[in-house]
């Protein structure tokens, strides 16, 4: 019988630490001026800690493709720097994905506002 978990599970703690460290590394460690202002929104880690998907957004949408290239190019460097900062048996391989949830949320909000504006007010 498994013991009930208290508080955060280890995977959640590791995920939060990876997110904090990567946010700092992206902010201070990426020297490529072509990259936009990057915000790390979420990190998902596999159960065996072999892979981590990093969801990010950027301030300048015009630099999205260039930022993807910069992150892909810096992936190995970011992973090695991450290994220096956190003590894990296995440092996950990093996969970067642009987080489209903010854009989808804004589009959905605009659609709701549009429907609300078109609907006549009933007394």
Curated annotation (Swiss-Prot):
Its main location: cytoplasm. One of its GO terms (biological process) is maturation of SSU-rRNA. It is found in: Cytoplasm. One of its GO terms (cellular component) is cytosol. Keywords: Cytoplasm, Ribosome biogenesis. It comes from the Bacteria. GO terms for molecular function: ribosomal small subunit binding. The keyword Cytoplasm applies. Belongs to the RbfA family. One of several proteins that assist in the late maturation steps of the functional core of the 30S ribosomal subunit. Associates with free 30S ribosomal subunits (but not with 30S subunits that are part of 70S ribosomes or polysomes). Required for efficient processing of 16S rRNA. May interact with the 5'-terminal helix region of 16S rRNA. Monomer. Binds 30S ribosomal subunits, but not 50S ribosomal subunits or 70S ribosomes. This is Ribosome-binding factor A.
């Amino acid at each position: 019988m498994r013991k009930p978990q208290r508080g955060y599970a280890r995977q959640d703690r590791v995920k939060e630490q990876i997110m904090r460290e990567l946010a700092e590394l992206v902010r201070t460690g990426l020297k490529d001026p072509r990259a936009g202002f990057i915000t790390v929104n979420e990190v998902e880690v596999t159960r065996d800690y072999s892979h981590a998907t990093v969801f990010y957004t950027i301030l300048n949408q015009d630099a999205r493709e260039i930022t993807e290239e910069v992150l892909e190019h810096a992936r190995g460097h970011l992973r090695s720097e991450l290994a220096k900062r956190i003590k894990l048996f296995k440092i996950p391989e990093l996969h970067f994905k642009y987080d489209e949830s903010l854009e989808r949320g804004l589009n959905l909000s605009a659609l709701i506002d549009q429907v609300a504006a078109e609907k006549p007010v009933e007394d």
